[in-house]
Amino acid sequence: MKNRDVIVKAGSRVLKSTPRKLNLVAGLVRNKKVSFATVQLRFCEKKAAGLIRKVLNSAIANAQNYGLDIDNLYIKEILIGKSLTLRRVCPKAMGRANRVSKRYSNITVKLGEII
């Protein structure tokens, strides 16, 4: 099987989940066929699986717009990146305060075609 370069891609920005949690789920479906990946993400019970599945479905829809056969598509790359970080203050004893970081993420899914 020869693999061509990236055919289609889709992305989502500023998702309320940390990159670390998204990377755990993205590792399940990297370099897998699209049909297998959608089933894996559907039955994974993590919130991150739902976020990645939405972006994957968007990439599949983009592939259909180009008239590509979905059975020959595989996930070439899933890129998880850092987005903005909200910083909050959590009051502690004796007048102290700790900082709490609320992290956001970006997802990019690139699909390739198996020839």
UniProtKB/Swiss-Prot annotation:
Species assigned in the record: Wolbachia sp. subsp. Drosophila simulans (strain wRi)
Upper lineage: Bacteria, Pseudomonadati, Pseudomonadota, Alphaproteobacteria, Rickettsiales
Keyword Iron-sulfur: no
Keywords: Ribonucleoprotein, Ribosomal protein, RNA-binding, rRNA-binding
GO molecular function terms attached to this record: rRNA binding; structural constituent of ribosome
GO biological process entries: translation
Biological function: This protein binds specifically to 23S rRNA; its binding is stimulated by other ribosomal proteins, e.g. L4, L17, and L20. It is important during the early stages of 50S assembly. It makes multiple contacts with different domains of the 23S rRNA in the assembled 50S subunit and ribosome. The globular domain of the protein is located near the polypeptide exit tunnel on the outside of the subunit, while an extended beta-hairpin is found that lines the wall of the exit tunnel in the center of the 70S ribosome.
UniProt name for this protein: Large ribosomal subunit protein uL22
Any one GO CC term of the record: cytosolic large ribosomal subunit
Family listed: Belongs to the universal ribosomal protein uL22 family.
Keyword Transcription among record annotations: no
Gene: rplV
Quaternary structure (record): Part of the 50S ribosomal subunit.
